[in-house]
């Protein structure tokens, strides 16, 4: 085998997994304990550092110095509410170093602090070593997966962790996308299929909808909950047994970290047992103050303890379907990913939601992501095997991208959930006469007004030759590449003069929570936004109409065809409306519409006389055929704004 083998690593919140694509198929590699998944745990003792199973196995003896959940810290600030709330549940200490969280442990008798990237890099090093032991040669190239909603700093930090571990990170890819690749390889040549990936892991929950067509994957929508997974089910069991211990023995063990940790380990084991049996027993010797704790739990009781959590997995499913504009009947395949999808109740809820549809469990849920990452790694290394040759991968823009137009309106060029890479072009124009330049302000978000969205950057296109408003044509292009880098270009069509801005993901892009918040708020505020949008559009319509009427009667070509009195009447009324507009920019929609009707009553009779008589015998014939009260339809004037 060539020495430049690339591996795929699923760096999970609680467990990680590594795979390699060779001899035309994927091998998921077992660690030295014979396990195909390895705990994402790092432990520090007086004598050594342990990673994986060894770290997790001694956690009850050494809770303060056993670090897990680094994925919940990576790429986040110390002040992040997520970090603050998670810290309450961790037995290890997290300290603040310049608003960056660090994990503080005692190692070989000294106090040490590590960045989350460093902890994750230790897990990645372990995965790299597992692969090297299997392949028999050093490995440097890897594809690492992250949750679909990781923001740029989280992705960057994960990449950094790979670099610290001595890996050349070929690409960071989304976990659901990786699972889809794993799935797509098994399923080629069936026409276009919509696949829903339901990924319930140890710490996170992601739902993704993909379209797979002839080897091409498109991500149609993603949704999820950063804080739902197997650990939450363990917590429910732990709380249940802490209460039971209180009832039976009148003692509270919740403050004793070692007791809680031993109980948690037993609960996790019981939970796994309940996926295949209807009852599980716990036997913990000398759990607290010498008391042995022997008890049992039924599957039904476990399901009841977690019923709200299980049910809540369906909300993101509904949201993803809405975003992908699909009905549940249009989903061809349901794919289960993540160890927690082995729970029968979770499977049943999903199956019932999709009216009894079969679930695809053909891929081992723990291994699907690493499987796909291994395939992607082979593609990026140029593997010539026909199994991977024609596999393409398309991602989506998580938020709409657009620019600000008159009145602070958000005009989206690239809609949310558009497949990237993509390129969209639209023509805009000037807002006032002889305007020398335009300010292009680029925003992301779902709200109607830019002030409620997130400003990504701005630039000016100057040197526009003097011209009446609405005449210059400015072509604006939004071009977003496969890595999510956005280029915005503005070109003045008359001069060919252009200017551009490049917005990379790290320029204040939003985190998953913010994206979710914006999307939720957008739904909540949709009604208010609609009113505002209509108001601005009524204002713009009135303004355009006034300026158009003004320029129509001032047209040199009409000299002598319109009486000075009529001309003055129109100009005065237009001027009155324009002044009123300047003074009343915040008027309501119906006020703008009322003003427009007033203006039309003055202008329409005059303009229609003008156009009806346009081919008539000289100017004299006009008076005779003027329709009373302007019953002739006014001209339809195209609005340019």
From Swiss-Prot:
Induction: By heat shock. Testis-specific. The modification Omega-N-methylarginine is found at residue 469. InterPro entries: ATPase_NBD, Heat_shock_70_CS, HSP70_C_sf, HSP70_peptide-bd_sf, Hsp_70_fam. The modification Phosphoserine is found at residue 631. The modification N6,N6,N6-trimethyllysine is found at residue 561. Keywords: Acetylation, ATP-binding, Chaperone, Cytoplasm, Cytoskeleton, Methylation, Nucleotide-binding, Phosphoprotein, Stress response. Residues 394-509 are annotated as: Substrate-binding domain (SBD). ATP binds at residues 12-15, 71, 202-204, 268-275, 339-342. Residues 617-641 are annotated as: Disordered. The modification N6,N6-dimethyllysine is found at residue 561. In response to cellular stress, acetylated at Lys-77 by NA110 and then gradually deacetylated by HDAC4 at later stages. Acetylation enhances its chaperone activity and also determines whether it will function as a chaperone for protein refolding or degradation by controlling its binding to co-chaperones HOPX and STUB1. The acetylated form and the non-acetylated form bind to HOPX and STUB1 respectively. Acetylation also protects cells against various types of cellular stress. Its main location: cytoplasm. Residues 617-633 have a biased composition (Gly residues). May be an auxiliary component of the CatSper complex. Identified in a IGF2BP1-dependent mRNP granule complex containing untranslated mRNAs. Interacts with CHCHD3, DNAJC7, IRAK1BP1, PPP5C and TSC2. Interacts with TERT; the interaction occurs in the absence of the RNA component, TERC, and dissociates once the TERT complex has formed. Interacts with METTL21A. Interacts with TRIM5 (via B30.2/SPRY domain). Interacts with PRKN. Interacts with FOXP3. Interacts with NOD2; the interaction enhances NOD2 stability. Interacts with DNAJC9 (via J domain). Belongs to the heat shock protein 70 family. Molecular chaperone implicated in a wide variety of cellular processes, including protection of the proteome from stress, folding and transport of newly synthesized polypeptides, activation of proteolysis of misfolded proteins and the formation and dissociation of protein complexes. Plays a pivotal role in the protein quality control system, ensuring the correct folding of proteins, the re-folding of misfolded proteins and controlling the targeting of proteins for subsequent degradation. This is achieved through cycles of ATP binding, ATP hydrolysis and ADP release, mediated by co-chaperones. This is Heat shock 70 kDa protein 1B. The lineage of its organism: Eukaryota, Metazoa, Chordata, Craniata, Vertebrata. The gene is HSPA1B.
